[in-house]
Amino acid sequence: MAIIIGSDEAGKRLKEVIKSYLLDNKYDVVDVTEGQEVDFVDATLAVAKDVQSQEGNLGIVIDAFGTGSFMVATKIKGMIAAEVSDERSGYMTRGHNNSRMITMGSEIVGDTLAKNVVKGFVEGKYDGGRHQIRVDMLNKMC
């Protein structure tokens, strides 16, 4: 499993904080926007492409508010994403929604909160069962 990460200019500093946190915790991290100045649309598309390239990959995109990246991610066939700004949502979106990507806003969450959100997301496991009905419904929409 790799954690694919990317950001636009507004999210670059927080992306580096999250990337360092993940690397310190021995995760395989791929930064698809490293050294680039990209729009949140391009950052989200690049992360989603790599997430979908291998089962088990997860994605994190950071822009100013998280909303733009979320809107892009939800337009991609087969992608279930969540805009998160709290630890519980980061964890629960994996367990109940089988989300493979989260988006966050660098102007919404601080460093410590962002690390805690990411921790919940990457450590969360999909519960399946009754939640699979909803996941199937979401996947039929695209």
Swiss-Prot record:
Pathway: Carbohydrate metabolism; D-galactose 6-phosphate degradation; D-tagatose 6-phosphate from D-galactose 6-phosphate: step 1/1. Its EC number is 5.3.1.26. One of its GO terms (molecular function) is ribose-5-phosphate isomerase activity. Keywords: Isomerase, Lactose metabolism. One of its GO terms (biological process) is galactose catabolic process. InterPro entries: LacA, RpiB_LacA_LacB, RpiB_LacA_LacB_sf. Pfam families: LacAB_rpiB. It catalyses: aldehydo-D-galactose 6-phosphate = keto-D-tagatose 6-phosphate. Disulfide bonds: none annotated. Heteromultimeric protein consisting of LacA and LacB. Belongs to the LacAB/RpiB family. This is Galactose-6-phosphate isomerase subunit LacA.
